[in-house]
Amino acid sequence: LYLDATTAAPSDTWEGRGKTMEIMSEITYKLSTDPENEKLLSYLEANRDELDDQTKREVEVLRKDFDQTKKIPAEEYIAYSVLQNDAQAVWEKAKNENDFAAFAPYLEKIVDFNRKFAGYYNADMKPYDALLNEYEEGLNTQTLDAFFAQLRSAIVPLIAKIKEVPQIDDSFLYK
């Protein structure tokens, strides 16, 4: 539906897509959190030695996805999917009209949902760390702070040196 929405579907069909997203998200949630999947994952994990490296990694990813999705209440999972659809439609229009204010409430709701989801994923982590771990496993703000501090210590003096160099006469470019 997303591909259809961003390529070929008429812009005024977003509400219908939202209803479809609601139905599909509910089905996806039920399938994704089905106890039978838990049994299958447990079986594969118990027989890990029989799996090739690719399948082992796929099982790890599936387990993580299963565990994370299961932590989110179904109604919030569904509501978030519908919100994403609605926000996409509003963003497209707001972008074309240079009207961020129209999109701002949707962005705020998306951020609120993600903060809530971060608490479900790991209540003991800072929300940003919990969400960052979703996309960059093992990375956290402490590591990023150290990285950017090191980067800053090299870049700031470099910029200062660049500023000290006399400007090149480029006036011929503008004749």
Model-based region annotation:
Residues 1-107:
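N-terminal helix-rich structural modules
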